[in-house]
């Protein structure tokens, strides 16, 4: 039986894990919901093309900023001393000036089939790797005990012949 080096098995496991992670990706959604208290919530803050999630203190903007946001309402981030617009559903942009029509469609059959196939392949590679490791471990363990047995019965150095 031809055996594969452990590096190949590890590389295949890493590739399978990466493919699985790419297919089943997750998105972090900020928890600043209009129904929640606006005093303290978690908001998505983007600075220099580096999105981060940070805990910030949020208050309403002063009354002179009423017309600042075109389709939404103004909020003031106290910790950062900056104002932002919380846009109404369907609008985006710094001042909620762009209409953004989102269309949600169910997953296509091809995407579901690809996901199932990749998960199945990942499970096969994982099971194969575990099988390979168990056989390798058993062979190594039996070789050690066989060598120990041969050393004792052959009358190695310093041992009387049996």
From Swiss-Prot:
Q: Propeptide residues?
A: 23-55, 102-162
Which terms does the record give in the GO molecular function aspect? epidermal growth factor receptor binding; growth factor activity; receptor ligand activity; transmembrane receptor protein tyrosine kinase activator activity
> Which InterPro entries does the UniProt entry name for this protein?
EGF-like_dom (IPR000742)
Q: Where is the signal peptide?
A: 1-22
Q: Per UniProt, which keywords does this protein have?
A: Angiogenesis, Cell membrane, Developmental protein, Differentiation, Disulfide bond, EGF-like domain, Glycoprotein, Growth factor, Membrane, Mitogen, Secreted, Signal, Transmembrane, Transmembrane helix
Q: Where are the transmembrane segments?
A: 113-133
Name-wise, this protein is Proepiregulin
Recorded name of the encoding gene:
Ereg
């Amino acid at each position: 039986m031809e055996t594969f080096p452990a590096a190949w098995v590890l590389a295949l496991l890493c590739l399978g894990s990466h493919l699985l992670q790419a297919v089943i990706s997750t998105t972090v959604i900020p928890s600043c919901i209009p129904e929640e208290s606006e005093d303290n919530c978690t908001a998505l803050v983007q600075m220099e093309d580096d999105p981060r999630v940070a805990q910030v203190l949020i208050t309403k903007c002063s009354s002179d900023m009423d017309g600042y946001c075109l389709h939404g309402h103004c909020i003031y981030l106290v910790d950062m001393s900056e104002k932002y617009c919380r846009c109404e559903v369907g609008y985006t942009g710094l001042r909620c000036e762009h209409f953004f029509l989102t269309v949600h469609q169910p997953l296509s059959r091809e995407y579901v089939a690809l996901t199932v196939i990749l998960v199945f392949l990942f499970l096969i590679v994982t099971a194969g790797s575990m099988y390979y490791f168990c056989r390798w471990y058993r062979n190594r363990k039996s070789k050690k005990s066989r060598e120990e047995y041969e050393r004792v019965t052959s009358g190695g150095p310093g041992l009387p012949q049996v």
